[in-house]
Amino acid sequence: MEKLNFLLKNTALLPTNLQKERLVQLVLLLNKWNKAYNLTSVRDPMEMLVKHILDSIVVSPYLQGNIFIDVGTGPGLPGLPLAIINPDKKFFLLDSLGKRISFIRNAVRELELTNVEPVLSRVEEFKPDHQFDGVLSRAFASLKDMTEWCQHLLTDQGFFYALKGQYNMEEVSALSAQFSVDKIIELNVPELVGKRHLVLLKKIRINLMNYL
């Protein structure tokens, strides 16, 4: 907890004591499961605080809307940390590997999270009965693949939230004409080596009246 408090001082985030306890508990659960199921290449719990917890929750101030889906979530990143500090928002966490979804289900039970829905599916095959205000991805795919594979999940007013390292103009150039970059935000992740960016993308709305 002391390490987490130290890291949080270098951000604008103000989680409650219960939320901080749950973030630490999530790290302990991930570390425990990782020994048996190899869920992440990060082995040190202190490193997990920086590379998985802080790297996820710094996105929180930029989320717009109430219902989100984290595609290719892996062991619930960034979805689980974001769900912990945003109890008023709903998060669907999608992955195609059973061991990852099993971990997420266990974490949801252990942490008593009521705003997380684990989904075992490939993103192209997932057909929900509603769309989402935001589609999140972290180390999932290129911007082009993310937008094309996930476009059926997003409302017309929603945003794609892509967590990236160094900003890559080639990825932007490869985007379909249906999508545009709305914002590129440089993220401050305390003690993380290397740059992190949040790329916000949206669908381009075509006014059919212009063609009549």
Swiss-Prot record:
According to its UniProt record, what is one Pfam family this protein matches? Answer: GidB
Per the UniProt record, which EC number(s) apply here? Answer: 2.1.1.170
Which superkingdom?
Answer: Bacteria
Q: Which reaction does it catalyse?
A: guanosine(527) in 16S rRNA + S-adenosyl-L-methionine = N(7)-methylguanosine(527) in 16S rRNA + S-adenosyl-L-homocysteine
Provide this UniProt record's keywords sorted from A to Z: Cytoplasm, Methyltransferase, rRNA processing, S-adenosyl-L-methionine, Transferase
Q: What is its main location?
A: cytoplasm
- Cellular compartments annotated: Cytoplasm
Entry annotated with the keyword Metal-binding: no
What InterPro entries does the annotation carry? rRNA_ssu_MeTfrase_G, SAM-dependent_MTases_sf
Where does the sequence pass through the membrane?
Answer: none
Question: Keyword Flavoprotein: yes or no?
Answer: no
Binding residues for S-adenosyl-L-methionine? G72, L77, V123, E124, R138
**Matching CDD domains:** AdoMet_MTases
Gene Ontology MF terms in the entry: rRNA (guanine-N7-)-methyltransferase activity
Any one Gene Ontology cellular component term annotated for this protein: cytosol
**Database matches in Gene3D superfamilies:** Vaccinia Virus protein VP39
- Which EC class does it fall in? transferase
Chain's role: Specifically methylates the N7 position of guanine in position 527 of 16S rRNA.
Q: Which family does it belong to?
A: Belongs to the methyltransferase superfamily. RNA methyltransferase RsmG family.
Which PANTHER family does this chain map to? S-ADENOSYL-L-METHIONINE-DEPENDENT METHYLTRANSFERASES SUPERFAMILY PROTEIN
Put simply, this protein is called Ribosomal RNA small subunit methyltransferase G
Report the source organism: Histophilus somni (strain 2336)
Q: What is the lineage of its organism?
A: Bacteria, Pseudomonadati, Pseudomonadota, Gammaproteobacteria, Pasteurellales
